[in-house]
Each structure stands twice: as structure tokens, then as C-alpha cells.
Curated annotation (Swiss-Prot):
Keyword field: Disulfide bond, Glycoprotein, Phosphoprotein, Repeat, Secreted, Signal
Gene name linked to the record: AHSG
GO (cellular component) term, any one: extracellular region
CDD domains for the chain: CY (cd00042)
Residues listed as glycosylation sites in the UniProt record: 96, 153, 173, 332
Domain Cystatin fetuin-A-type stretches: 24-130, 141-252
Record family assignment: Belongs to the fetuin family.
Residues forming coiled coils: none
Protein name: Alpha-2-HS-glycoprotein
Stretch forming the signal peptide: 1-15
Keyword Glycoprotein: yes
Record organism: Sus scrofa (Pig)
């Protein structure tokens, strides 16, 4: 009986197919394909940020490419980003946005993404990010007298934003602007001033006639703007300097319609509003791919000095990841790896990562 059992086990082992086990490959972090996946990830960040500033790619730290059945590949990619000076509501293309410099107290993002490539198209399956300002020590090494980021709920910051917006509305011949969010602030001790940046929305009231601002409503076709102000304390008074830019609404690019469809007038929407869920999604929600996921209560923290990316990208998978075979990062044998010949002609296995730094490292 024991001999029969052993023979059965041996026959079962012979019956197992010895096909190859699919593994991952590790392309260079600066490969064209890797950069395409990274740029798709950055585009995803900027389209789903509800507040704060757009981010741009700074460096690809690592990348693994896994096969995905029934079709496509998944890029498991880690990237570093830097905050730009463009607010998320600003329709300015990212390529035209300046990176915030070290002397301005720069902010860096650190993100992990799973990006699907299928039929030449990239789509995000999973996103997890966090961001943080440069350390005070590093800022002062570069610029000893440069001001640091201040908490956005600091009473001096709130007062500066309200005073700057009130001053602008008082001098404006256009629509009354309403505060949307305070985005950034710095306390400047040498001049006893507060520098503040904030987003605004256009209302249906005329600025100089808005005697009851609470009765003013946002436009049906929402339109946003961005302001920068400085409030300087003087003896028994304060000086206020402020500039505001209202973003232009842009026409929708219509898709081809079936024959007989109603060819009405082209609707006009705010490009900045479509780039962010702020206008259409409740404050307690965020958009992740094609789905809306509730954010855990109590965030973002009250005493924040910037909008941390982790409050929008906390590792929630997109609905797209449910299509086809699920993707899981596992301990699978590697596939063919790129290599760089050594001076003696041997070919050591070298993974050319991390990639180049596009701006500066924090």
C-alpha cells in the first residue's frame, strides 16, 4: 500500500506542467516608456487634487513591469514630484507652470503608482502619495532670511486673506469674488507682513454693489480665480497689496453625435473646474478613477501649512483594476533584466535606477 501511494505521488508530480512562470522586468528609470507611465501618474494627481497646487515630475525612483492577463502590463512605479506655482483650479498647462523654488519653501511629493499599459494607453489602477515641505534647516541654508510656510488657520493668515480679498472687491468694477480656500501663507518677520495666496470664485453680484455678500451665489457655469496678497502692519493701520486673476472659461470639445441628435449650442464650462472635483463632488469625497470614494473623517488636519497629497491619494484602487485578472505584486521570479557591460567585458546585472533629477532634490 505504501509503495502504491509513493508511485501515485510520483505520477502526480510528473503530470504537473513545467511551463515558464511569468515574472517582472525592470526597465531603466529614464526609459521613454517608464517616463510615459510616470507622466500619466502625474497627470492623474493633478486631475484629482481637490485643492492646493499642481505637481510636476522630478524623479523616477524605481520601476517594475508586471505582465497582466488577459492583456497589458502594469508599471509598479515610485516617483518624486515637486509642487508648482499653479493652483489646481488654474487651467494653465502643466508644462507652463513654474516649479516652486527652494527659497520659496518648496514642497516635495512621494508617490507609489500602479499604471496599466494596454493598447498603447496608460491608466492608473492604484495611487498612494504623501507630500511634505522642505525642512526649515535646509531652507535657511540656502536663504537664511527666507520666511517659512505658516499654518493656514493662523489668525494672522486668515485676517490677511480676508483683508486682501475685501480690498480687491472694493476696487473692482467686475463681479464680487468669494473666498474658496487659503492655499499658502508665509509670515515675514523683518517687514511684519503676511504673504498669502488663495483661490476665489466668481459670483452673480457686482463687487461694488455687494452689500450683502451672503446673498451672492456662484455662477451656474462656475468660474474661479487666484489671488496673491500681502498685508503689512503699520502703526494703527495696515497696508494691503493684492492682485487677482480670474481664469477664463473654455469651450467643451464635443464628441461626434449620432445622426439625429440635438445639435444645440456648444456649452461653456470652466476648464479648471473640470480638472478638479472641488466644484461637483461633496467636500467629504474625492474622485479616484471612475469612482467616488469617501474620505475618512477628520482630514485634512486643521494646523496644516500645505495640502498633503496623502489626503487624496491614500492607496485606494481604481475600479479599473477590477477588470481582467487582478494585479498583485508578488515574489515572482524576475524576467530578463537590463544590464550594462563592465570595463572588462563582463555583463553585471545593473538596474539603472533611480532616474535623473529634473529640477532639484529636497
Amino acid at each position: 500500500l505504501i509503495l502504491f501511494f509513493c508511485l501515485a505521488q510520483l505520477w502526480g508530480c510528473r503530470a504537473v506542467p513545467h511551463g515558464p512562470i511569468l515574472g517582472y522586468r525592470e526597465p531603466a528609470c529614464d526609459d521613454v516608456e517608464t517616463e510615459q507611465a510616470a507622466l500619466a501618474a502625474v497627470d492623474y494627481i493633478n486631475k484629482h487634487l481637490p485643492r492646493g497646487y499642481k505637481h510636476t515630475l522630478n524623479q523616477v525612483d524605481s520601476v517594475k513591469v508586471w505582465p497582466r492577463r488577459p492583456a497589458g502590463e502594469v508599471f509598479d512605479i515610485e516617483i518624486d514630484t515637486l509642487e508648482t506655482t499653479c493652483h489646481v483650479l488654474d487651467p494653465t498647462p502643466l508644462a507652463n507652470c513654474s516649479v516652486r523654488q527652494l527659497t520659496e519653501h518648496a514642497v516635495e511629493g512621494d508617490c507609489d503608482f500602479h499604471v496599466l499599459k494596454q493598447d498603447g494607453q496608460f491608466s492608473v489602477l492604484f495611487a498612494k502619495c504623501d507630500s511634505s515641505p522642505d525642512s526649515a534647516e535646509d531652507v535657511h541654508k540656502v536663504c537664511p532670511n527666507c520666511p517659512l510656510l505658516a499654518p493656514l488657520n493662523d489668525s494672522r493668515v486668515v485676517h490677511a486673506a480676508e483683508s486682501a480679498l475685501a480690498a480687491f472687491n472694493a476696487q473692482s468694477n467686475g463681479s464680487y469674488l468669494q473666498l474658496v480656500e487659503i492655499s499658502r501663507a508665509q509670515l515675514v518677520p523683518l517687514s511684519a507682513s503676511v504673504s498669502v495666496e488663495f483661490a476665489v470664485a466668481v459670483t452673480d453680484c457686482v463687487a461694488k454693489e455687494a452689500y450683502s455678500p451672503t446673498k451672492c451665489n456662484l455662477l451656474v457655469e462656475k468660474q474661479y480665480g487666484f489671488c496673491k496678497g500681502t498685508v503689512t502692519a503699520k502703526v494703527n493701520e495696515e497696508d494691503v497689496a493684492v492682485t487677482c486673476t480670474v481664469f477664463q472659461t473654455q469651450p467643451v470639445v464635443l464628441q461626434p453625435q449620432p445622426a439625429g441628435a440635438d445639435a444645440g449650442a456648444t456649452p461653456v464650462v470652466d476648464a479648471a473646474a473640470t480638472a478638479s472635483p472641488l466644484a461637483d463632488v461633496p467636500a467629504a469625497s474625492l474622485v479616484v478613477g471612475p469612482m467616488v470614494v469617501a474620505v475618512p473623517p477628520g482630514i485634512p488636519p486643521v494646523h496644516r501649512s500645505h495640502y498633503d497629497l496623502r489626503h487624496s491619494f491614500s492607496g485606494v484602487a481604481s475600479v479599473e483594476s477590477a477588470s481582467g485578472e487582478a494585479f498583485h505584486v508578488g515574489k515572482t521570479p524576475k524576467g530578463a533584466q537590463p544590464s550594462i557591460p563592465a570595463a572588462d567585458g563582463s555583463v553585471p546585472v545593473v538596474r539603472p535606477c533611480p532616474g535623473r533629477i529634473r529640477h532639484f532634490k529636497i
